[in-house]
């Protein structure tokens, strides 16, 4: 079965980014967990993905325990019609508002399923979360 692989660059600030590979079967919640792992953050706050790149505006997908949906754990990357160079925003911790810019760098076809997101590359030191 043919599957798509997405390679995304997750930028926190200039010089601090992570490159992550996920399959079209992974959800936005899987991407959330991979970002936190890549930046060594604890998973103890709400989050949202804003598909137009603007916080608190437009099409958004929310953490599963948020009051409103649609929920990130129900949205597969393969259903988002992502394109190369497309950018969207990940906002973590609605109090501190950690803001990450995500850019789709590659979309590859594979018949080898990727079971877990893979952190391909890191650049720059991750800041302290607290």
Q: What does each of the following model-derived ranges do?
A:
Residues 1-130:
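Short linear regulatory motifs enriched in tryptophan with gly/pro/ser
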């Amino acid at each position: 079965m043919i599957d798509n692989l997405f390679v995304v660059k997750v930028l926190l600030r200039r010089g601090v980014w992570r490159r992550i590979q996920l399959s079209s079967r992974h959800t936005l919640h899987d991407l959330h967990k991979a970002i936190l792992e890549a930046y060594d953050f604890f998973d103890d706050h709400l989050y949202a993905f804003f598909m137009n790149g603007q916080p608190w505006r437009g099409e958004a997908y929310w953490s599963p325990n948020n009051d409103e949906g649609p929920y990130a754990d129900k949205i597969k990357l393969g259903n988002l019609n992502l394109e190369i160079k497309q950018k969207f925003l990940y906002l973590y911790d609605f109090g501190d508002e950690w803001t990450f810019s995500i850019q789709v760098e590659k979309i590859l076809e594979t018949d080898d399923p990727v079971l877990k997101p893979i952190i391909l590359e890191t650049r720059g030191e991750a800041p302290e979360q607290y």
